[in-house]
């Protein structure tokens, strides 16, 4: 009987630890206005504004605790619809000043969204997983969704490609 109780205690302890998982979702900003190549801080174009609204649908069932964005028009405009929908303030971060261990510590047990750039998001993921897996995103690709899950010492990661053209075509059939 004592062995049975011990096994139950172990099983419930493992289950409780699983509740402290951190989920970090990372996306690149949506399509930017490329009409002025000298503009270092462009706004989103029409397609980008549409994509920003589609991200709201993608994250409909995710209850974020925090939302992070770089301090650029295109990243803030990408995440603003999600921020408004979830009623969560956007926190500004600098990708060149990230301490990944500190970030993981401050977001422990939370669901977090991070929005950045083609040359920062893959490296942010690599920093979180402490492994060089992901490369810079192609400049015309605004469709990657990375997810990092940290449960105690177990880290899993994945990359999804959200093809809006296929998604829009599918919706038109409904």
Tell what function each PLM region has:
Residues 20-106, 121-124, 131-145, 150-156, ...:
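Active-site-proximal alpha-helix that buttresses catalytic centers in soluble enzyme cores
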Residues 6-7, 32, 117:
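Short amphipathic alpha-helical "recognition" segments used for binding
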Residues 24, 108-116:
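Generic beta-sheet signal
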Residues 1-21:
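Bacterial Sec-dependent N-terminal signal peptides
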């Amino acid at each position: 009987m004592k062995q049975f109780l011990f096994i139950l205690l172990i099983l419930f302890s493992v289950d409780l630890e699983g509740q402290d998982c951190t989920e970090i979702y990372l996306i690149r900003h949506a399509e930017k206005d490329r009409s002025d190549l000298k503009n270092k801080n462009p706004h989103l174009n029409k397609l980008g504004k549409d994509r920003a609204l589609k991200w709201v649908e993608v994250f409909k069932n995710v209850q974020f605790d925090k939302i992070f964005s770089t301090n650029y028009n295109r990243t803030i405009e990408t995440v603003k619809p999600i921020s408004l929908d979830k009623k969560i303030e956007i926190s500004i971060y600098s990708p060149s000043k990230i301490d990944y261990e500190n970030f993981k510590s401050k977001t422990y047990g939370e669901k977090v969204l991070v929005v950045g750039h083609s040359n920062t998001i893959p490296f942010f993921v690599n920093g979180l997983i402490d492994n060089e897996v992901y490369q810079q995103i192609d400049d015309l690709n605004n469709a990657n969704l990375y997810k990092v899950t940290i449960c105690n010492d177990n880290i899993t990661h994945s990359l999804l490609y959200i093809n809006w053209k296929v998604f829009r075509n599918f919706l038109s059939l409904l």
